[in-house]
């Protein structure tokens, strides 16, 4: 007999495999990219401040835009929010390979940080479509993330012995692989939102995020 439950289970397993594999390749590439940028800037400027600035450029995205990116994910949809940022990250890295410019590094670092933030929000939004056990699945994602961080560091340490340019080329490839895996996810998925949230306009949502951000900064600094 035809069993719809088996089909759902197979779909969940496939989505889990694609999402976890994409996370691994994306995080591995991001780690190697960050180390590559740090190496490039230090070798070019020999300045600790300039070297640290590339990390600041990446983290700045989360601090300034983090509260608003959830709105973008909701408006654009999960597939757009996961696949497009990975493709963009891959291509802008390849641009840097052909255009060797110090200031371009900071722009690319900011853009990749922006893309990774959107991807992270969309990934978390997709999890309820795979499993109801969010605690275990989030623990699995964290384990994969840590393994990818180690793998990215090892990847960088091996490839840097041959060429820094090759680091960025291979990193770009990992982003494209991640985009392909995310593209293979079930596309018939929409972000589940509460009715009170869905009834809000974009302007109201942005205003709420700004108020929340201001309140958070007051708690931190006042």
Predicted regions and their residues:
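Transmembrane alpha-helix termini and helix-breaking/packing motifs in multi-pass membrane transporters
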Residues: 38-43, 151-170
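MFS-fold secondary transporters
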Residues: 33, 42, 93-96, 112, ...
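Helix-loop junctions on the cytosolic side of multi-pass membrane transporters
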Residues: 125, 129, 168, 172-197
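Helix-breaking motifs and short loop linkers at transmembrane-helix boundaries and internal kinks
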Residues: 45, 77, 99-100
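Helix-loop boundary and gating motifs at the non-cytosolic
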Residues: 9-61, 218-222
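Juxtamembrane intracellular "pre-TM" segments in multi-pass secondary transporters
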Residues: 5-16, 188-222
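C-terminal ends and interior cores of transmembrane alpha-helices
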Residues: 87-100
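Substrate-agnostic recognition of the 12-TM MFS/MFS-like secondary transporter fold
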Residues: 18-34, 58-71, 79-89, 104-160, ...
């Amino acid at each position: 007999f035809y069993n719809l439950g088996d089909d759902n289970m197979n779909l969940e397993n496939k989505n889990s495999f694609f999402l976890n594999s994409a996370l691994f390749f994306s995080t591995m590439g991001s780690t190697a990219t960050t180390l590559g940028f740090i190496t490039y800037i230090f070798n070019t400027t020999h300045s600790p401040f300039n070297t640290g600035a590339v990390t600041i450029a990446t983290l700045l995205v989360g601090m300034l835009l983090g509260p608003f990116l959830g709105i973008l994910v909701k408006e654009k949809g999960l597939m757009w929010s996961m696949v497009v940022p990975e493709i963009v990250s891959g291509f802008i890295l390849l641009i840097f390979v052909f255009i060797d410019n110090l200031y371009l590094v900071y722009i690319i670092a900011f853009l990749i940080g922006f893309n990774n933030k959107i991807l992270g929000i969309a990934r978390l939004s997709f999890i309820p479509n795979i499993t109801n056990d969010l605690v275990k699945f989030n623990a699995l994602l964290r384990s994969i993330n840590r393994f990818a961080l180690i793998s990215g560091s090892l990847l960088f340490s091996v490839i840097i012995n041959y060429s820094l340019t090759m680091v960025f080329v291979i990193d770009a490839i990992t982003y494209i692989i991640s985009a392909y895996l995310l593209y293979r996810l079930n596309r018939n998925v929409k972000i589940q939102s509460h009715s009170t949230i869905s009834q809000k306009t974009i302007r109201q949502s942005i205003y709420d995020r700004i108020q929340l951000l201001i309140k958070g900064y007051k708690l931190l600094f006042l």
